[in-house]
UniProtKB/Swiss-Prot annotation:
Substrate binds at K158, D190, T228, K229, F230, E231. SUPFAM superfamilies: S-adenosyl-L-methionine-dependent methyltransferases (SSF53335). S-adenosyl-L-methionine binds at E79, E104, D131, D154. This is tRNA (guanine-N(7)-)-methyltransferase. It comes from Haemophilus ducreyi (strain 35000HP / ATCC 700724). GO terms for cellular component: tRNA methyltransferase complex. Keywords: Methyltransferase, S-adenosyl-L-methionine, Transferase, tRNA processing. The keyword Methyltransferase applies. It comes from the Bacteria. Pathway: tRNA modification; N(7)-methylguanine-tRNA biosynthesis.
Length: 249
């Protein structure tokens, strides 16, 4: 096994995700999912091996220096769970005055995202393959983010699994500390129950977080959010989508 192969393959590991009680209190650490071997294609592996030095960020226990990473002081937007990364790359390409960091635990998605970033020749994007809760806790400085995007997270449909949902009181509390004044939180889901849960959690932080919806709940699908592969599939199945957009005072 070559050294380059080892680098990409070591990203395929078990990722732990924090588990919370229904009222948002930290409960314990659980193994939420496993990054399975055999799904990372040779092409995706090569993209990670060959371009990680430019696009990749590794987990660290101290805050990232975004100015050093990007070479400028442009606003930084963090996206959690970018899937295959196409919409994230498109957003970065359309907004060169913003810097984007994407977190994804599945290495095929990381490899695909890097490949598309290379194709689109974007310089304002970095990717991380690690548990998002640990990145937020350890590697993102307070007040350093201009925005947080979370599109179509796992809804954990069964009631007994709702505590595994990433959007919980403690999660949003941490997001609030990481955002700069005027920074945004943008969630999207195609599960109504999860949308209502997200809304209830976000409302707990009023007036520090302001809902931009004129109706006080959800916003229309914004044109600036590219259509994801996941969303397009949902549309074909007749699924509705709920967007929430809150801004920190």
């Amino acid at each position: 096994m070559s050294e380059k192969y080892t680098f990409a393959d070591q990203k395929r590991k078990t990722v732990e995700q924090a588990e919370f009680t229904e009222d948002g209190r930290y409960l314990r650490k659980v193994r939420s999912f496993v990054l399975r071997t055999g799904r990372l294609s040779d092409f995706q592996r090569d993209m990670m091996n060959d371009h990680w030095a430019k696009f990749g960020l590794d987990y660290q226990k101290s805050p990232f220096d975004f100015v050093e990473i990007f070479g400028n002081a442009n606003p930084v937007v963090l996206e959690i769970g970018f899937g295959m990364g196409r919409s994230l790359v498109e957003m970065a390409a359309q907004n060169p005055d913003r810097n984007y960091i994407g977190i994804e635990v599945h290495t095929p998605g990381v490899g695909a995202c890097i490949a598309y970033a290379v194709e689109k020749q974007v310089d304002n994007l970095r990717v991380i393959c690690h548990d998002a809760t640990e990145i937020l806790r350890d590697a993102v400085a307070d007040g350093s983010l201009a925005g947080l995007q979370l599109y179509f997270p796992d809804p954990w449909q069964k009631s007994k699994h709702h505590k595994r949902r990433i959007v919980q009181t403690e999660f949003v509390m941490r997001l609030l500390t990481k955002l700069t004044a005027g920074g945004f939180i943008h969630f999207a889901t195609d599960w109504q129950n999860y949308a209502e849960h997200m809304l209830a959690v976000l409302r707990q932080f009023s007036p520090a977080l302001v809902n931009t919806s004129p109706t006080g709940d959800f916003i229309d699908r914004p044109a600036f959010r590219p259509l994801t592969k996941f969303e397009a599939r949902g549309q074909r199945l007749g699924h509705a989508v709920w967007d929430l957009y809150f801004v920190k005072k």
